[in-house]
Amino acid sequence: MPPKKGGDGPKQPPLIGRFGTSLKIGIVGLPNVGKSTFFNVLTKSQAAAENFPFCTIDPNESRVPIPDERFDFLCQYHKPASKVPAFLNVVDIAGLVKGAHAGQGLGNAFLSNIFACDAIFHMTRAFEDEDIIHVEGCVDPVRDIEIIHEELRMKDEEMIGPIIDKLEKTAVRGGDKKLKPEYDIMCKVKSWVVDEKKHVRYYHEWNDKEIEVLNKHLFLTSKPMIYLVNLSEKDYIRKKNKWLVKIKEWVDAHDPGALVIPLSGGFESKYQDMSDEEKQKYCEENKTQSILTKIIKSGYSALQLEYFFTAGPDEVRAWTVRKGTKAPQAAGKIHTDFEKGFIMAEVMKFTDFKEEGSENAAKAAGKYRQQGRNYIVEDGDIIFFKFNTPNQPKKK
């Protein structure tokens, strides 16, 4: 069957942010809200989780494997010599405080660490504990969210002024017509962030040209954000906390579409130390379960990443690509020669492979398809690439 021709497929929405696959998500919040405890559980590492502000000064970074039943199934089926899952790069960033944009606390260093990330786990505290001081004196997660939001917005406001001044000098007073569109776009960004006091990502109607300009500057408020609400173990198990509704209302009003995920660092830490039998018994008795898998997958998705599989007896591997990646560029993740000499991608959907029971059965059922260079790779595709080897240099 020849590769399908067709068009370029559905138009993908433009993506705000760094282009690439080695992207990071940072854990951000006020001091003593549970960031390092969460990071420790997430990465099974032992970053210092001390009860005082700024105990995490150098960001701790870790690669967290993405839990995936499809990957596990392929490994069980092929029993490969090598297994390589996809990973989420997570950074534990020290607590921000009010005034961080102006250098309060260790503000400038922490904000630069957030600049280096591509999405944010925004952690807020909704548990009371006399032994764990709160930097603001009392627990109020909505206030805490607003503090972090305002610090990020104020830092962007500081950046926007000089950018517009420079563009005004060259595009308006200097008459450089090529830069005039960028100047106009930055004025729109200024109106939104400085005058309306909103985050870049709140506005969902940025067009391609505007996103091109936003991606030159990578503003803090353009980064996707997932809200993690840290509860006590008791509240997490009973699925009740007086702050949850208020937090959801705030997020729906200010950051519509953003995820709010309740968790309990205390529960997850305890759960991680249990044996499999103890975990099962505890979860059945308390009608609860770990939320880590959902958080990890949500973080990966927030970075606009997905992965395809190559699978066989030598290796089962998940290859990370940006959403909307076409087959030749996906092939290039394996080796540049695969992209240069791309002929076609032979693609099976994981569900078809599992349902039919083997590659040959999937072929016989017409579910093993040959796709051309316009094919947009989908999450969980199992792909075999065909390519021409580039000509070797001729010997003299």
Curated annotation (Swiss-Prot):
Residues 304-387 form the TGS domain. SUPFAM superfamilies: P-loop containing nucleoside triphosphate hydrolases (SSF52540), TGS-like (SSF81271). InterPro entries: ATPase_YchF/OLA1, Beta-grasp_dom_sf, G_OBG, GTP-bd, P-loop_NTPase, TGS, TGS-like, TGS-like_dom_sf. A motif (Nuclear export signal) lies at residues 267-274. Its cofactor is Mg(2+). GO terms for cellular component: cytoplasm; nucleolus. Residues 23-283 form the OBG-type G domain. It is found in: Cytoplasm; Nucleus; Nucleus, Nucleolus. GO terms for molecular function: ATP binding; ATP hydrolysis activity; GTP binding; metal ion binding; ribosomal large subunit binding. Keywords: ATP-binding, Cytoplasm, Hydrolase, Magnesium, Metal-binding, Nucleotide-binding, Nucleus. Signal peptide: none annotated. Mg(2+) binds at S36, T56. ATP binds at N32, V33, G34, K35, S36, T37, L231. Belongs to the TRAFAC class OBG-HflX-like GTPase superfamily. OBG GTPase family. YchF/OLA1 subfamily. Monomer. Hydrolyzes ATP, and can also hydrolyze GTP with lower efficiency. Has lower affinity for GTP. HAMAP family: YchF_OLA1_ATPase (MF_00944). This is Obg-like ATPase 1. The gene is ola1.
